[in-house]
Amino acid sequence: MECYYIVISSTHLSNGHFRNIKGVFRGPLSKNGNKTLDYAEKENTIAKALEDLKANFYCELCDKQYYKHQEFDNHINSYDHAHKQRLKELKQREFARNVASKSRKDERKQEKALQRLHKLAELRKETVCAPGSGPMFKSTTVTVRENLNDVSQRESVDPINNQQDLIPSEEKERDGTTALAETETASNCTANNCQIGDQSQAVHRHRIGFSFAFPKKATVKLESCSAAAFSEYSDESSMEKEFSRKTRFVPSTSHLQLPPPTCELLSSEEKGNSPPPEAMCTDKATAQTEERKITSNENNTLLTSSFCQLQHYIPTCSEADTCQNLAPFEDQLPMEAVIVNEDGPVSKSNPNIIEKNPTVPNDRTSAQMTTEENITINDVTKMETRNKIDHEPLTPSSTIEESIRLQKRPDLCKRQCDPFVPVLNKLGSTVLQWPSEMLAYTTTEPSISYSCNPLCFDFKSTKLNNNQDKNKLTLNDLFSEQKEDCCKGAHADCKDVPIARVTNDETGHSKNDYPQVTTLSPVHVLSNGCDLGQNENVGQRYKHISCTNRQTNKYKFTRCQIKRDMLNEKYDKMRLKETREHWFHKSRRKKKRRKLCRYHPGKSSKEPEGSGKTERSRQRTDEARKNPREPVLEKHPRSPERASDLHQLPDERPKAASTHLGEKETMNTTVNTESNDAAPGSQNCGGKNATVVNEQAKPLVIHSVKQNLTYVRTYCCWKARTSRYQEDDGSLASQSNVKGPTQNQPVKRGYSSLTNDSERIHRKRRQHSCSYSSDESLNQQHHLGEYLKPLSTSLISCQPKKKRRRKRSRLHIGDGTTKMKGNSNYPMKCSSLSQPDELAKDCIKEDINPQENVSIEKNSEQTEQTEIKGMLHPYNPLLSEPSGEGEHSVTETTPCDSSQTSNDLATPVNVTRDPSNSTTDNTLLEHNQRSQTTNSNEKQTPFKVTNPERNFRHSQAKSYICRYELAETIPQGKTNEASTEWLCYNSGILNTQPPLQFKEAHVSGHAFVTTEQILAPLPLPEQALLIPLENHDKLKHLPCEVYQHIIQPNMLTNKVKFTFPPPPLPPPSTPVQPLPLQRPFCSTSVTTIHHTVLQHHAAAAAAAAAAAAAGTFKVLQPHQQFLPQVPALARTSIPQISVGTVGPRLCPGGQPALVASPQMPIIPASVLHPSPLAFPPLPHSFFPSLLSPHPTVIPLQPLF
């Protein structure tokens, strides 16, 4: 039945009439819009409808025929028809959607295919193929090129051109280092290359390589005889990388098979590029036949074999890389074959020939690398190892390797240019592009290239390994370049040295004196192959020994272990560069241990053999640099005597040197540049000083970046030293006389080397802890070591037993041993910047009453014994000044010391860091005499004091808080416990202002204490607290009472270290003499915190002491940067308070307390003690002079 309900949404009839009625259809509307139609019109319309019935009233969608217009319209408007219409539209829409999606997919596929094609095209065009981009990413087959001859011809010709290009650059590299003969030979080589290359092109042009692959899962077991056919440099490479990857092939001795028969098979460029044996062995006339003879020849076996193997016998592409490929790569073959050549003929052969090798192999390898990119190493492991070896300038032992590889590095990049080797398939129809990474070659006469199935090859690992090698390259490039530069400089000298002499006498120097020798003179290396081991540390010695064993034992597999050791050492050295600071701490500890064993008190006679040897090796280095040195020797009257020390040692081989040399190896590269500059200075002060200079320069040099700074430092030290030397020459002589003639110079040397080693360690370490603002700060660093020596010597005599027992082995060498040491090194103390005239300026003129000194000395002795425990703390920011109230420290400063107070703020750190100085009073006596003589130069009357006094003066002279600050003596324990941050602070402040003269203030017979003394570490053994307050600025203006509450006892316990020394001896009864006071350095003196952990007694004793005496304290904030020039100040401000028995002396009852600024809280000795000792603020009139230097910089309001 028809549905007569219309679709409500429709507003038009099917014939286009507008329909304003919703609901049941009533019929069409009249034209005029009236609902009521004329009857006539109605008839007409009906008639028309009937006429049109059959034709017009057919619904195609529903396939229905209507005879009446009304019926048709009803149908059109019915739900039935509308539903069908909707279904139809949905179908159409869905179809369209499907079509669109399909078309889109097709488009995407086409785009991807196009992209793939473009990528493939680009990859084929690429000149360099990164490892790992092999067959996985590229189609391995290509249509056969029509003319294979063209391919082989082009590829064989190119290498020759490349090689010719390479030769000039290499010759440039060798310019300064190699002789004319070498250049001529190289040029001849190139000529030969051209000729032979042209000849051989015709012969080998038709050949193309072939390859076979093992099935994927097949475990191929090669018989021993057949396995010998495969070149085993895969094994060699795995020696290097064994810890990371296992070797793919069974190790065999086959890799030693000499490739000489290859010379027949050598491709055009191979013959040209490989150093023709005529070139290598000058006496040989013809290339091919002679080469065979040579290889058969036993003596020359080593030369030719090593060279043949060194020369990548990489066949050109023309020879299809397989048949002629005598692959043993130089890189896989340990260069030691060449280096350790012990056969007579090799060492006899011209140095030119051997020296030529670095270039010749390069010429050849470069050419072959470029041409023969196709044939790489056994697997990528080899590639990595090759890169690794190339990029790692090994330790000086493998210096020839290094030089060759340095030159070869550019070639490596070119070598990888052609990532695929064209290989003919079985049918001969197509040329397979075989990834060259995977190819390896046998050493058989027609060398066969073999590789594993590409599906089995691990490209990722090779890529990772190559990345690692690149990283290593970045680190080692600097090192190797430096070595290269050094080598160029010293190469001429190296050549002059007769080999016999090198082996006997100069193995000692060869490392220090001629680091270049080891680098670039292969003659030296060849002759000394075994001897070099002595110079390097033990691991490298093993390396050389292993090299000889390898040669004799046909490269036994034990080389894996040795090489692993080598690699570990290399990595250690790299790590040393990267994380020096940690390493320095470690090495310092080790050195201490070694010295404990080495310098045992009973063995003082043997000592020169141990410690002295290390120094002797260095002295030999000085001796070896005769050219710069000898004029200097003549300059200075006393230097020849000391220089004699240098020459007494020729026979003794310093065994201990090897232990230290490992550390120095990294330094040696840079030391050369500076050693020449430092040499005169070191010679001036005698052999010992020379050694000291070199040592100092070396650790400083570790930062190759700072070469110029270190140069300045060494130079300045030398100047100051020379001036100082002239000043002190007489005093030294008198001191030596005082000491007595019986002292052994060897013993002295031992002592000097001992102190130098420790100094060197400290200096290295200091170099990292300090950030220096200028060259002067570096200079300060240079001198720190000097300060150490006398101080530690003074301390040792008084040290408590425990420490003494530990250090005695190092320190108690005997009274005689240190006699010259303090003096000889002392000249170095002159501030490196100060010239002799500047010395006079900087020197502080002081008057001291001998009585005062005596009293001070007694007091200092007493306090010192109590406090020595802390003495050995490695960082001693506050140099231990005798515990006498610092009166003595100022008086005792020698002019050099005073000048260095300005320059050597770093010195405080050093002083106690080197406890290893021997304890003789003699050195102290000398030191005091020197200081007295220098003072007398400045018109101060020299006075003599007892040995204990001298001890303390000796140590006192060393402690300077700041150039402008009167360095108050602090118990040496306290000084030793000072933190390294003080060093950072010191380095910057030093050079900002001219030294201020000392001021004497007398207050009622008591020494008037200026801010210097307030701030300076007092020699009091009493308890003191370190109160690190982060919000110190907020609390700065609070009165002491408020401060008291801010500081919580738990906070104190957390942040304060207590050291409990033995109870202090009673203070000396003699009244304190007026102190000569230096004008304070306003900007830093008060606000400089010696971030030191002060010594503390037991709580009861401390509390009693605190109650008994008005406390003095110092607030020093090293971490606030008060001067713009001082970049390296520590970061946290720590008010430090020491309460001691000195209070009544420093602050007599009649006068207001000195220490009363509100920002300086005074905390009682015991942490739990509730009430602080508060002093009223000082009037400004007390310190009129303090404001003058830097009024703007003073951060403390009330104190000034």
From Swiss-Prot:
Residues covered by region (Disordered): 252-280, 343-367, 582-687, 727-777, 799-828, 874-949
Biased segments, Basic and acidic residues type: 604-666
MF annotations from Gene Ontology: zinc ion binding
BP terms from Gene Ontology: positive regulation of dendritic spine maintenance; positive regulation of gene expression; positive regulation of neuron projection development
Key word Zinc present: yes
Disulphide-bridged cysteine pairs: none
Residue spans, zinc finger C2H2-type: 57-81
One CC-aspect GO term: presynapse
Keywords (A to Z) from UniProt: Metal-binding, Zinc, Zinc-finger
Basic residues bias (residue ranges): 585-603, 800-811
Entry superkingdom: Eukaryota
Keyword hit for Metal-binding: yes
Residue ranges with Polar residues bias: 667-687, 732-756, 891-944
Name under which the protein is recorded: Zinc finger protein 804A
Species for this entry: Mus musculus
Gene: Znf804a
